[in-house]
Amino acid sequence: MTPYDDSPAQAVSTAPRTTGPSLIDGFGRAVTYLRVSVTDRCDLRCVYCMAEHMTFLPKAEVLTLEELDRLASTFVGLGVRKLRLTGGEPLVRKGFIGLVARLSRHLSSGALDELTLTTNGSQLERYASDLARHGVRRINVSLDTLKPALFRALTRGGDVTRVIAGIDAAQAAGMTVKINAVALKHDNAGEIPALIQWAHGRGCDITLIETMPLGEVDQDRTDQFLSLQDVRRDLSSFWTLTDIPDSTGGPARYVHVAETGGRLGLITPLSNHFCDTCNRVRLTCTGTLHTCLGRDDASDLRAEIRRGASDAELVDAIHLAIGAKPKGHDFQIAAAQPAVARHMSTTGG
């Protein structure tokens, strides 16, 4: 097979092997979850994510598929058990399905528990069966509204019917779909109950996310901030919400909604941070390793690869970065300007 075609990958892990819980930060937290942005490009222009007339990175600055494979596989060799591919929009990256096929070897070998992705859903109808064939069992789909006009406005031109068709295709292919919705005070606040009912009616969990101060540095994020503590209080006035003791090391805290029978996740980086149990790091499409979404601390792994670093040297660079992972983020809703001046399309959503 050619390196990144769409053929089934051999069931052999080529990740550098270590023993024990390899990636432990300075606060004793094990890093077992890697999010990898495979591209900064996207076919939508969501208002809280990127500029309308976005200037994308030169291709030379973006990791090749081979480089993405090498870095992700190195992390798997160091004990990462969950790998999430993001963007931009990952499904617009040329050769993406081939990359998924290659990375699926770590599922076959048992080195990786889960290979998944976050998508805007616009290309999902086309690629759902391929993703399922290569071992993707769960996906997250970003969907902030079901209203066609509002969806077009928030995404600057998107078609919500394509996203819904993609969700249908993913479920038909056997994948579990979770909906991610950003809570926006002036746009979808009144639609949140209906969105939850719609998701649960389709057998999908849904997670609400507070706006985070990243992205366009000239934008005031306090205007759209909607506290999910307030949302939960309002929902509790007509639904029965029961906390679910589900500790995944992630930012979401889950409740069961008795009246719909579904799960609702709440990600509250501003009103109630999630740092103490953080088990994840992010690799951007340019090879920058961010050990905290809300801090500017970073390590340039692309430079290591392109200078010809050996596997052992690459492992050392990763250990050094993980050792410097901060205790918590710098997000504060009182600060009108973003705490971190970088686009989520590059960092990975």
From Swiss-Prot:
Q: What is this protein called?
A: GTP 3',8-cyclase
- What sequence ranges are listed for the domain Radical SAM core? 26-245
> Could you say which cofactors this protein requires?
[4Fe-4S] cluster
Q: Which reaction does it catalyse?
A: GTP + AH2 + S-adenosyl-L-methionine = (8S)-3',8-cyclo-7,8-dihydroguanosine 5'-triphosphate + 5'-deoxyadenosine + L-methionine + A + H(+)
Origin organism of this chain? Caulobacter vibrioides (strain ATCC 19089 / CIP 103742 / CB 15)
User: What is the taxonomic lineage of the source species?
Assistant: Bacteria, Pseudomonadati, Pseudomonadota, Alphaproteobacteria, Caulobacterales
Q: How does it assemble?
A: Monomer and homodimer.
According to its UniProt entry, the function of this protein is described as: Catalyzes the cyclization of GTP to (8S)-3',8-cyclo-7,8-dihydroguanosine 5'-triphosphate.
Keyword list, A-Z? 4Fe-4S, GTP-binding, Iron, Iron-sulfur, Lyase, Metal-binding, Molybdenum cofactor biosynthesis, Nucleotide-binding, S-adenosyl-L-methionine
**What's the family?**
Belongs to the radical SAM superfamily. MoaA family.
Q: Which domain of life is it from?
A: Bacteria
